[in-house]
């Protein structure tokens, strides 16, 4: 499929004026980013998770090093010190695959201040949560889920998929 982006990004201000986002929630989210709180944005397909993540990234200080990890590049960060990493599928012989889990592990060696995972979808969520809890405060990701309970259930399932015996 082909993902088309708007010629002009949808900003928090636009979301507030359209009634999609309450002004108080927008202010809270900005303070959460500036306060380096870890965030997981959840919602259904087409709900605007990536749009919200792009908006949140606008409030990351320009002095911070940010690593983005995605299956397909969709995040459009404006900071000067951004390293964008993308998954790579296996070749015709089934070799050379680089998945999000590999990228997350390697990103930790790049000394990021924050890590943004475009979409958490499998066993890599365990590495993401460990990174969030070991000094990479302010990291963010998205997750397909219909509500808060579903998001927590999906996180639990993805951790189980990691293959790590907890």
What are these regions (language model features)?
Residues 1-35:
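P-loop NTP-binding catalytic core
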Residues 26-45, 55-166:
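Switch/coupling sub-region of P-loop NTPases
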Residues 49:
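Conserved lysine of the Walker
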């Amino acid at each position: 499929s082909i993902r088309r982006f708007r010629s002009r990004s949808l900003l928090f201000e636009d979301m507030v004026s359209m009634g999609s986002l309450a002004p108080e929630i927008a202010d809270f989210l900005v303070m959460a980013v500036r306060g380096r709180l870890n965030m997981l944005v959840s919602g259904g397909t087409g709900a605007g998770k990536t749009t919200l993540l792009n908006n949140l990234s606008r409030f990351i200080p320009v002095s911070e090093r940010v690593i983005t990890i995605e299956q397909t590049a969709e995040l459009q960060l404006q900071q000067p010190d951004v390293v964008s990493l993308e998954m790579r599928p296996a070749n015709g012989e089934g070799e050379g695959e680089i998945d999000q889990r590999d990228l997350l592990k390697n990103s930790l060696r790049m000394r990021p201040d924050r890590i943004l995972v475009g979409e958490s979808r499998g066993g890599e969520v365990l590495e993401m949560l460990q990174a969030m809890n070991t000094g990479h405060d302010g990291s963010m990701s998205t997750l397909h889920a219909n509500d808060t309970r579903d998001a927590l259930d999906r996180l639990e399932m993805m951790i189980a998929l990691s293959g790590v015996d907890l």
